[in-house]
C-alpha cells in the first residue's frame, strides 16, 4: 500500500492509494490501486435505509476498503429524525467492530449523543471525528474516549499546536488538493512540510492498525 497522506476525501487523488476515498451505497466504483472507506452519510439516509446499509455492508468487506464511514449524527443539516440517524449510526458501529475496521465519524452538534452510543455499545475500536474545528480541550477529551480527530482546511490553530504529534491526522474532505492543507499546517507548526507529511502518513497507518491494540493517552 502507498503512503496515505489524506485520511478522508470525496475525490480521487492523482496518485492512487494516497488518500482514503469516501464511497457510498450510490457511488462505489472500486478502481484498482485506490483505498476507500464506505458509509451512509446522515444527509443521505433514505426511508429504505436498511437496503442502503445492506449495500454498505457488502462493499465494506472489500480488502481495499480500509475504514467504515463517514457516518454519524447531524442536528444541523440532516432532515432525518435523530432516532433514525442513531439507528443507522449503530449499524455502522456494528460493522466497524465486526470487520475490525476503524470508523470515520461525521458529527454536528451531537457529541454527547455520539459518546453515549460509544459507551452503550461497548466499542473497542477507535473512531476518527473528521473535519474537526473545535478547541484543544474537547479534542483531548475525545481522545480519552477513544476518538481521534482529523483536521481539514478550517482547523483550529490552537488545536493543531496543542495536539501530540502521534495523533495528527489531516484530510481534504471536499476541498480538493490536500497539499494546500499541508502547506498551511507546516507553516503554523513551523515545520518542514515533508516531515509533516511523513508524520501524518505514519499516524494514519497506526490508526488503521489500531483495531488490534491501542492505548489512548
Question: What does each of the following model-derived ranges do?
Answer:
Residues 1-217:
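Mid-domain alpha/beta scaffold segments of enzyme catalytic cores
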Amino acid at each position: 500500500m502507498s503512503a496515505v497522506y489524506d485520511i478522508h476525501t470525496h475525490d480521487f487523488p492523482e496518485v492512487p492509494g494516497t488518500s482514503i476515498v469516501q464511497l457510498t451505497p450510490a457511488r462505489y466504483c472500486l478502481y484498482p490501486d485506490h483505498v476507500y472507506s464506505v458509509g451512509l452519510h446522515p444527509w443521505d439516509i433514505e426511508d429504505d435505509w436498511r437496503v442502503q446499509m445492506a449495500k454498505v455492508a457488502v462493499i465494506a468487506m472489500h480488502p481495499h476498503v480500509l475504514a467504515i464511514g463517514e457516518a454519524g449524527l447531524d442536528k444541523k443539516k440532516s432532515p432525518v429524525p435523530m432516532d433514525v440517524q442513531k439507528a443507522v449510526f449503530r449499524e455502522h458501529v456494528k460493522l466497524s467492530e465486526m470487520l475490525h475496521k476503524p470508523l470515520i465519524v461525521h458529527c454536528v452538534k451531537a457529541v454527547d449523543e455520539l459518546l453515549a452510543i460509544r459507551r452503550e455499545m461497548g466499542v473497542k475500536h477507535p473512531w476518527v471525528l473528521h473535519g474537526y474545528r473545535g478547541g484543544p480541550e474537547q479534542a483531548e477529551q475525545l481522545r480519552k474516549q477513544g476518538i481521534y480527530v482529523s483536521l481539514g482546511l478550517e482547523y483550529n490553530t490552537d488545536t493543531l499546536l496543542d495536539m501530540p504529534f502521534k495523533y495528527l491526522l489531516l484530510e481534504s474532505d471536499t476541498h480538493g488538493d490536500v497539499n494546500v492543507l499541508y502547506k498551511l499546517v507546516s507553516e503554523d507548526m513551523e515545520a518542514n512540510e515533508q516531515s509533516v507529511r511523513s508524520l501524518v502518513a505514519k499516524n494514519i497507518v497506526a490508526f488503521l492498525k489500531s483495531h488490534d491494540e491501542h492505548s489512548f493517552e
